[in-house]
Amino acid sequence: MNTPKELRYTKEHEWVRVEGENVRIGITDYAQSELGDIVFVELPEVGAEVTANEPFGSVESVKTVSELYAPISGTVVEVNEALNDHPEYVNESPYDKAWMIVVKPNDLSEIDNLLTAEQYEAMINEG
């Protein structure tokens, strides 16, 4: 399982990468492997407001539908439209091609509430 050290993580298996004043959000390698083959991704529109710990979209796999939870509150400034035609990117490249949304946070310090890579790995290893 791949857990990049420079990212922050949620207990719901989203990852966050700080990029200047914005954050890029996706789901973890662990999450995609648990879900199985992803067949559909539903994401919000640019301009939508997201609230920390609240759903902002969903991923549908051959096994189940799983909600996506915002790790931080703010405004969606970019959406990965490529996932409309290529949901399989979530399985193939969860930290690169399969980012979900970019958010301009209301308060970037909310990132401090998220898990480090080490904390996230410990959580999933506890099962």
UniProtKB/Swiss-Prot annotation:
Question: What Gene Ontology terms for biological process does this UniProt record contain?
Answer: glycine decarboxylation via glycine cleavage system
Q: Which family does it belong to?
A: Belongs to the GcvH family.
> Which superkingdom, per the lineage?
Bacteria
Gene name, per UniProt, is gcvH
What protein does this entry describe? Glycine cleavage system H protein
What are the Lipoyl-binding domain coordinates in residue numbering? 22-104
Which keywords has UniProt assigned to this entry? Lipoyl
Chain positions found as N6-lipoyllysine? K63
User: Source organism lineage?
Assistant: Bacteria, Bacillati, Bacillota, Bacilli, Bacillales
What role is this protein assigned?
The glycine cleavage system catalyzes the degradation of glycine. The H protein shuttles the methylamine group of glycine from the P protein to the T protein.
> Can you supply one Gene Ontology CC term for this chain's record?
glycine cleavage complex
The keyword Acetylation belongs to this UniProt entry's keyword annotation: no
Q: What cofactor requirement does the entry state?
A: (R)-lipoate
